[in-house]
Amino acid sequence: EAISGKFKALYCEGEDIAQSDPNTQHVTHALESMECVIVQDLFLNETAMYAHVFLPGSSFLEKNGTFTNAERRISPVRKVMQPKNGYEDWEITAMLSNALGYPMNYKHASEIMDEVASLTPTFKGVSFKKLDELGSIQWPCNDESPEGTPTMHIDEFVRGKGKFFITEYVPTT
C-alpha cells in the first residue's frame, strides 16, 4: 500500500526491513515511494539508505525493555550502561511523538510494558517485575496462564480448526 501512495511515511526502529524481508525488491520499491522514511538504528543498514531522517539507536546494553523471539518468549533487557547517544530508544520515540503532537509522557520503559499489558489480552499478565522474577515468559500470559504458555494449541486452535491457505508456487529464476 506504500507503493500505491496510501502510506506516506514510515518509522522503522531497530529493524532492517530492506534486508530481512523475503521480497526485498518490493520493500525497497515501497521505501522509495514514501514521502518520509525515518530510521532509528545502531547502524547505517540497507533500510537507512532510504531514510530521509536517521536517528541513533541504543544497543541492548544501553536500554531497558524486552525482546520477544519467534517462540513467543518475552525476555527482559536491562540497561548496564548509559546510552552513548544520551537516550534509550523509547525516549527518542516518545520525544518524536510529543513533537508531532501525540503525547507520550512515560518516565520509564516499564510504563510502556504496563500499557501494552493493559491493551493486549495475550500480554495481560506481563510486567517488568514478573519478567525479572521469572527470567522470561512465553505469551499468552494472562489470568488463565499467569506464568505464560510454553505450548499452545494442545487440544485445539484458538479460532477452531486450523486454517490452511493455498498459495501459488513461483519458481525462482
Describe the role of every protein-language-model region:
Residues 1-127:
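Non-catalytic alpha/beta scaffold blocks inside enzyme catalytic domains
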Residues 113-173:
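Long, low-complexity segments enriched in small/aliphatic residues
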